[in-house]
Regions:
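Active-site-proximal segments of metal-dependent phosphoesterases and phosphodiesterases across multiple
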Residues: 111-123
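Structured beta-strand-rich core segments of catalytic domains in phosphoester-bond hydrolases
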Residues: 35-38, 42-114
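Short, contiguous clusters of charged residues that form electrostatic/catalytic patches at enzyme active sites
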Residues: 13-16, 88, 125-132
Length: 147
């Protein structure tokens, strides 16, 4: 199984590159970060024509994550913890592979630069909440964490 990760820095601006990548390498799963598109503006059809399913947690102009997969994924979760800034930064899904269920976790971590700013404080808050949530996942099943 091939699982790839790509910070695309705008899925719409890179859609031709994404389609080319899918055709050339044929990953089973591609996890994308910084898609910079709301769900309704995401290029679903372009990716579906490449025989992939889309699982999207979009946001206008910034952030956003997506998982595209050849197989149907289950238990899609967005907002796995309450983000006080309501940013689209994590999407999870269950992948059934052979006799196992694997939790896919696609993360786009906040930039905290510079130190001693509100952005840095937010990043620390966000990472603390992420770690709490991941500890629960790590106890239950196999996980693939990418981002």
């Amino acid at each position: 199984m091939i699982i790839s990760s790509w910070n695309v820095n705008s899925v719409r601006a890179r859609i031709e590159n994404i389609k080319e990548y899918l055709k050339k390498y044929s990953p089973d799963i591609l996890m994308m970060q910084e898609i910079k598109a709301q769900d309704e503006n995401y290029p679903y059809e372009d990716i579906e024509k490449s025989n992939y399913q889309n699982y999207v947690f979009g946001q206008k102009s910034y952030n956003g994550v997506a998982i595209i997969s050849k197989k149907k994924l289950d238990k899609i979760e967005k907002d796995i913890f309450k983000d006080k800034n309501k940013q689209s930064r994590i999407i999870t899904a269950d992948l059934k592979h052979k006799s196992k269920t694997i939790k896919l976790i696609n993360i786009y971590t906040p930039n905290g630069n510079p130190v001693d700013t509100e952005k840095y404080t937010y990043k620390l808050y966000w990472l603390e909440n992420l770690i709490k949530k991941l500890k629960g996942y790590l106890k239950k099943k196999e996980n693939i964490i990418i981002g």
